[in-house]
Amino acid sequence: MKLYLAILSLLVSGVAQADSLAVTNLFGDPAKILLTLFEGAVALTAFSGIAVVIGRRSGGQWTQIDAIRFGGLVINGVMAAFLCLLPFLIISPTAALTEDSWNVVLFWAGGVGLLEVQWRARVAWVLIKKQLDEDSGRWLPIVTILTDVIAYALVFLVAFDLVEIHEFRMLVFLIVWHLFSAVYLFLRLIRHSGVKISSADD
């Protein structure tokens, strides 16, 4: 738990610095922030995946909700890593960097995010229809898909200059959102793992 609190505190500090850094040199310190978040996304996804797979293999049983959560964990981790590298794939480091450059990045991020949103909507429908979630019934899948829709709707609002948020800061918020979702799904997998943790009194 301490590891994840440390990661989340690092992400929050990155968001806090993003706005001030982005108005100076868009490929200076912001690039360093993106690469740091990329390393965190890869490490988090790899660690969570290994821990979950080894734990489930020892238990010998995967339920449908387990598979859905694990898939969501991996997708959120991959999305976070992809968004970290997206500016380096789209913006030429030799070109003059402007607000329009980050707008292009947000449009690409939003387009890819729409694919993730429709996947999450289909998963939420399965969870609601079969009532697979152990302790939240139907409300949690609905809240999850709504927050995802709001996050990517905000991306397009910022890209079209309808909301006053710096484009780089919006990108960092989006990366943090996916990392938070991955951590949350990992904790849900651990909580409903079916493994009994013995206390010192046992």
Task: Give the location of each predicted region.
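N-terminal secretory/membrane targeting signals
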Residues: 1-18
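Hydrophobic transmembrane alpha-helical segments in integral membrane proteins
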Residues: 23-44
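Juxtamembrane helix-loop boundaries in multi-pass membrane proteins
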Residues: 35-39, 62-80, 131-148, 201-202
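N-terminal signal-anchor/start-transfer transmembrane helix
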Residues: 39-58
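Hydrophobic alpha-helical transmembrane segments in multi-pass integral membrane proteins
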Residues: 81-88, 146-163
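Membrane-proximal helix-loop-helix units in multi-pass membrane proteins
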Residues: 89-152
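Small-residue-rich transmembrane alpha-helices that serve as helix-helix interface/gating elements
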Residues: 168-184
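Short, highly charged, low-complexity non-transmembrane loops/tails of multi-pass membrane proteins
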Residues: 193-202
